[in-house]
Amino acid sequence: MKVVFISNYFNHHQAPFSEAMNKLTNGNYWFVAVEEMSEERKNMGWEHDDLPDYVIKSYKSKESLDYAKRKIDEADTVIFGLSGWKNFKLIQKRLRQKKLTFRYSERIYKEGFKWHRFPIQALKHWLVGGRCSCLYMLCASAYTAQDYAKTGCYLNRTYEWGYFPKTKRYDIDEMMGKKLSARSAGWKHPCASILWAGRLIGLKHPDVSIRLAAALKEKGYSFKMSIIGNGEMEQQLHDMICDKNLDDCIEMLGAMSPDEVRKHMEGADIYLFTSDFNEGWGAVLNESMNSGCAVVASHAIGAVPFLIKDTVNGLVYQNGDECHLEMQVRRLLDDKNYRNQIGREAYKTIINMWNADNAANRFLTLAKSLQKGNGADLFDDGPCSKAQIIKNNWFTC
């Protein structure tokens, strides 16, 4: 089967899936990048020094663009991860010929549904593929199906998807033994580690972690909190730490490469994910679960309803409810065995289900089934299972 993946640029989040697809298709896989990576992303360590041969930089020249278009037209199936009319024209010919095509998208109403803009938006999404019965939706957010259903598009044609960063396989017992709580077990005051990582910007709410630390310290908990990242809120966070006298329990480590962040995840007991509904997916959830962290995450994050089963492989708190967040973190700090169990189940979720190899296998199975006109309910859960409509208020504490 010939497969083409079209996206803005090639990065470390897409590499594992692309490698798996290239292997499974015996080299009949191409990744079409339509633009140069932004300087901000390059500075975050997202750039690949040596791009695989299957990556086509269609923006480099007319010859490259023509080559990409030929591959797109000839492919058995295409994954289209872009928006806008200009980009949509890349798959227009396929859709006219009723060739199997998938679009993948995060949610489109991150900032809420606005009735006054609805008629124009609905028409736009209907014109840009929503009307085409051969175009299916890979939902890179648990809220994608809900958002597109409001426009009347992709009804009963939505599948669970996401981002699939590198999956690491560990000796789980050895890794759990490296967590700070395990290493400090013999200390006079055993200590648990809490990690927060991401850009220090409003939608990610890093300030919530500092108020949490203040509440935990006041109640006498022994912990060390690390905050990784930089951004517009950095000085504000430093000031909060100073004002609340939290220098002894919080460290701000600045920006790091993805590999360095993973090392910190491997040593962390608890991972905090505090973003709001503007967080389309949140690949740090995959990575922290893969690292055996007991994750406490906002219900608003796109990846959370797909990846986390509350109280089984992670804890969910109601977005914006800092008291509920504190309660969930205290549950983990109060019971090391429960915390360890949550971390182990999180690791299993990524190793057994939410990884690039499984996603690639399932995608090809789904594509072949759809090409034959067979039923598309092939999987009960996980990548390529039917994506149900999940509303913003699905979780209440």
Model-predicted regions and their roles:
Residues 300-311, 315-316:
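Short acidic/histidine- and often glycine-rich active-site loop of Leloir-type glycosyltransferases
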Residues 132-189:
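Donor nucleotide-sugar binding/catalytic pocket of nucleotide-sugar-dependent glycosyltransferases
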Residues 255-256, 263-268:
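Short alpha-helical donor nucleotide-sugar binding micro-motif in glycosyltransferases
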Residues 54-55, 238-256:
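Nucleotide-activated donor-binding/catalytic signature segment of Leloir-type glycosyltransferases, i.e.
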Residues 324, 331, 338-352, 359, ...:
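A short, well-ordered alpha-helix in the C-terminal region of glycosyltransferases
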Residues 176-177, 183-204, 210-213:
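Conserved donor-binding/catalytic core segment of Leloir-type glycosyltransferases
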